[in-house]
Design a protein with these regions (language model features):
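Non-cysteine beta-strand/loop elements that form the S-adenosyl-L-methionine
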Residues: 33-39, 208-212
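Short, acidic/polar
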Residues: 16-20, 108-117, 227-237
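Glycine-rich anion/phosphate-binding loops
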Residues: 9-26
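An alpha-helical appendage that flanks or caps ligand/catalytic pockets
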Residues: 48, 56-98, 132-241
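Acidic/polar active-site rim loop that often engages polyanionic ligands
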Residues: 42-52
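Hydrophobic faces of well-ordered beta-strands that scaffold small-molecule active sites
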Residues: 2-5, 32-36, 104-108, 123-128, ...
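Structural motif
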Residues: 27, 120-121, 241
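Long hydrophobic segments that form regular secondary structure
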Residues: 111-125, 131-135, 143
């Protein structure tokens, strides 16, 4: 895949998304994927005048949204759709995606409802490893893949990470500290925390500081910090617990 586009399903009509995605799949020569976000930031819903639904209902909406998209990608003739959230007639979309049967779907659901959505609907789940370590990650990934197998599917687990590679571990650690502590844009991160509702009133100071550090270091990704050998070893550990890819 050459890259993913992200769509917020409550704010994008599935007919438009299906046509846009199929077009991009042709432009990219069949190297396109669609990252689906079921929505969580209420301000965005208000900006678009979209209905604010409960957490689990947003995933239910996402299932129907994706069902309609996939039908548009597969039906050769016009069809009608009568669902809980969408009702449409004379639906039709050409060209169909190059990839068969469909472009891959990614989702970053981490809650029980989100994990179920990813396991039953997506080809890839974007995993946030707890505590930035592999210890608790295996259970997360095993649970996701078991849910997928129980639905007759296979799903990959992906993470995002950041790399600080130097000749020695100390040089890597020192450089990480330098660009985070001395060069980091803490004003921007604090603005982000406020937008996310993660202020000192809701999180302990230590948790806030950890979030700030890893966000500046690499958008909160998994730290791959050290010598080339150390980083290769760490990637190997991630593969052992079931990680299929790193962005």
């Amino acid at each position: 895949s050459c890259g993913f586009s992200t769509t917020h399903v409550p704010l994008t009509h599935p007919v438009a998304a299906a046509k846009q995605a199929a077009t991009i799949d042709h432009i990219s020569g069949g190297r396109f994927g669609l990252n689906i976000v079921c929505g969580w930031f209420k301000n965005e819903f208000e900006m678009f005048g979209a209905e604010w639904r409960t957490h689990d209902e947003r995933y239910e909406y996402g299932v129907e949204w994706l069902d309609l998209v996939r039908q548009l990608w597969s039906h050769s003739k016009e069809f009608d759709f009568d669902g809980k959230y969408f009702n449409a007639k004379n639906l039709w979309s050409e060209p169909k995606p190059l990839q068969s049967p469909f472009p891959p779907i990614m989702n970053a659901g981490g809650s029980p409802a989100g994990q179920h959505f990813a396991a039953t609907q997506a080809e890839m789940n974007f995993v946030i490893l707890r505590d930035h370590g592999v210890e608790g990650g295996k259970a997360q990934i095993d649970n996701l893949k078991e849910m997928a197998r129980n639905s007759g599917r296979e799903v990959q687990s992906w993470i995002h990470g950041y790399v600080v590679c130097r000749d020695t571990q100390k040089e890597a650690d020192d450089y990480l500290e330098h660009y985070v502590r001395a060069k980091g844009d803490y004003v921007a991160v604090d603005n982000l925390l406020e937008i996310f509702g993660m202020q000192s009133e809701t999180l302990a100071p230590e948790a806030l500081d950890t979030f700030r550090f890893h966000f500046i270091a690499g958008h909160g990704g998994y730290p791959l910090v050290g010598t080339p050998e150390r980083i290769v070893d760490e990637i190997g550990k991630l593969m052992e617990i079931g990680i299929d890819g790193i962005l």
